[in-house]
Amino acid sequence: MTVNDYEDAKKLFEEVYDNTFVMYHEDSDSFAAEGLAVAMSYKIGGKTAKFKTIQGVKSSNVTLTQVYELHKNSLFTYVEKLGVLQTSEGKMLSGEYIDVVLGEYWIRFRMEERMQRLALTQDKIPYTNRGIGMLVGVAELVLSEAVAMGIVEEGQYRVDYKVREDVDSNEVALRKYNYILWTAMLQGAIHTGQISGILTYDIVNREEA
């Protein structure tokens, strides 16, 4: 959401919410956060919320101190840098990056959707290694799609599971299987960094004779 009064923004400094991000902009007609939400609805989880230009929104009249305070408390604003209008950060009030939260939801909901579709399109998912393999295959498919979305790094995910022989017979009788565990490395994004260099009068690359 967009907060238009800095004092109101300060009241949110102690709040911690995983699913809420707050932008400060003194212009009540800016709707900066709402515009960012629309931009982040495309290629979910695969792009950072920082550095984004929001059409029709002017730079916020904030001081460097205010920007520092906002960022310290996981809020952000809309500024101009190098002549380009852009969001100054991209975090939820919890401190987690917006793209990470969206990526987690994308994987979770897509996994549920694909598992449900599997159950609906098959006569049954047999409680055998073949049936377990069907579930594992769905999990691997969703994670491969998460790679294509830019959420997960290529080659950096795995799906662990128990084979039928290792499952207690009582659970088989209950038709319950809770042994698929996937692990994936977030692709992440670079937001800040330092480039170092040296100017010298010495020859750097000598030509071979």
Regions found by a protein language model. Give the residues of each.
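Structured, hydrophobic secondary-structure cores that serve as assembly/anchoring elements
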Residues: 90-209
